[in-house]
A protein has these predicted regions:
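Residue-level recognition of single "structural anchor" positions
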Residues: 1-160
């Protein structure tokens, strides 16, 4: 099984009606393994020091507190899924559930060498889920101008 790592930013934003609305953004990627030495540099790259980080009980996350993060844990092994009403990992688990259904329902199976591309598609769909189809199309079109990806470049996307 190829390890995949994901992080989700949870925040509240003011919508067009002036109401506060929950929003979440995902970063996800194929990783070589789920050990501390692999995950901590990724977390440091995307998460500001001092931020509150909610995780499950994976040992690789134990160093987060000493790295300057406010680390809170849900220990699923102890059937702990919500702590103090705000510490939970349900949102990222919801993203993974959508990703698995996308693979099963649309693609049926994916190879390791193209897994990151499928993850990128799922992340894009999640992060733009509140946009209209025309806004999504326009955004994708604008981002693809000048972008040329050859088959041999795709074949280079191998898992480490």
């Amino acid at each position: 099984k190829t390890p995949v790592f994901g992080m989700m930013e949870r925040s509240e934003i003011e919508n067009s009606k002036g109401e506060m609305e929950f929003m979440s953004y995902v970063h996800a990627m194929v990783v070589g393994n789920t050990k501390k030495d692999s995950l901590m540099p990724i977390i440091s790259q995307f998460v500001e020091e001092g931020a509150t980080v909610f995780t499950d009980e994976l040992n690789a996350y134990n160093a987060l507190g000493s790295m300057g993060y406010n680390h809170k844990v849900c220990d699923h092994g102890q059937l702990q899924f919500v702590v103090d009403g705000e510490v939970y990992t349900n949102n990222i688990e919801g993203f993974w559930s959508h990703f698995r259904r996308m693979i099963t329902g649309c693609y049926h199976d994916v190879s390791d060498e193209h897994l990151q591309s499928y993850i990128d598609e799922a992340v894009y769909r999640w992060n733009t889920r509140k946009a209209s189809q025309s806004e999504r199309f326009s955004d994708m079109f604008n981002k693809s101008i000048g972008l040329i990806v050859t088959w041999s470049e795709l074949k280079l996307c191998k898992v480490a």
